[in-house]
Design a protein with these regions (language model features):
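Conserved class I S-adenosyl-L-methionine
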Residues: 1-39, 41-50
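Class I SAM-dependent methyltransferase SAM/SAH-binding core
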Residues: 51-96
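A short acidic, Gly/Pro-enriched loop at the edge of an enzyme's catalytic core
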Residues: 98-108
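A short SAM/SAH-binding and catalytic strip from SAM-dependent methyltransferases
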Residues: 107-121
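A short glycine-rich, Lys/Arg-flanked "PGG" loop and its adjoining helix->strand segment in the class I
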Residues: 124-136
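Conserved beta-strand signature within the Rossmann-like core of class I S-adenosyl-L-methionine
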Residues: 137-144
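C-terminal alpha-helical "lid/dimerization" subdomain adjacent to the S-adenosyl-L-methionine
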Residues: 147-193, 204-205
Length: 229
């Protein structure tokens, strides 16, 4: 994944890959509003900060922002774009949020990120990491595409998964790579992976018009389940 997102950061069209900075505040406010929340203060972990298009606005809301990304080149851009003194930029591995400590986040934000992860195992590992870094009373705000029910969407997912590595071997562009195109969970798989991560849904919404083929655009507010015993 690091190679793919370093390549995106090196492009003169980086906004094409990570989103338009001019709409970042509106998207952020809309995400919180559609989930009936307006979090402020405390520590926010921004998962997949990219070149920092939302980071500065998060710094206005929260006392501290840990903006994490898998790409060193994206973090270089983010540091040059965001001057807020309450932001720490953190390089993380592709499958987790190390070196962040347990229970450190009052809020976890993951927006336009899970859609790019190339397999269910990586999505599930990120959900577990959200639970790990969340404080006991913390909330995670997550956006992701969820496959619509039916045989045709399932068939499309299988065919797409088989074709993407072949296409990436012929075409070298960022958008052809599995690490950009991502994987689509079914609703049942998402429920299973949330349960395994000990995360519960406290608010949910969907876009009226999804930008994803054969998938709903889903927005979730998540909280940690209490530890047993």
């Amino acid at each position: 994944m690091r190679t793919t997102w370093d390549a995106a950061a090196a492009s003169d069209r980086v906004e094409q890959y990570v989103g338009d900075p001019t709409t970042a505040r509106e998207e952020l406010d809309s995400l919180f509003a559609r989930l009936g929340d307006d979090p402020r203060g405390g520590t926010c972990v921004e998962v997949g900060c990219g070149f920092g298009r939302m980071t500065g606005f998060l710094a206005e809301r929260f006392d501290r922002v840990a903006a994490v990304d898998v790409s060193p080149r994206m973090l270089e851009l983010a540091r040059s774009n965001v001057s807020s003194r309450n932001v720490e930029f953190v390089l993380v591995p592709g499958g987790g949020l190390d070196p962040l400590e347990d229970d450190v986040a009052d809020v976890v934000l993951c927006y336009l990120v899970l859609q790019h992860l190339p397999g269910r195992d990586l999505i599930a590992s990120h959900l577990r990491e959200f639970a790990r870094v969340l404080a006991p009373a913390g909330r995670a705000f997550v956006q992701l595409p969820v496959l619509v029910p039916g045989l045709r969407p399932r068939g499309w997912r299988a065919a797409r998964g088989a074709a993407l590595p072949l296409v990436a071997g012929v075409r070298r562009g960022v958008v052809e790579r599995p690490e950009y195109r991502g994987f689509r969970l079914t609703g049942g798989e998402l429920e299973e992976d949330l349960a395994a991560a000990r995360l519960r849904v406290t608010a949910r919404d969907e876009s009226a018009q999804s930008p994803y083929r054969y998938a709903h655009e889903v927005f979730l507010r998540l909280e940690k389940e209490a530890e047993p015993g």
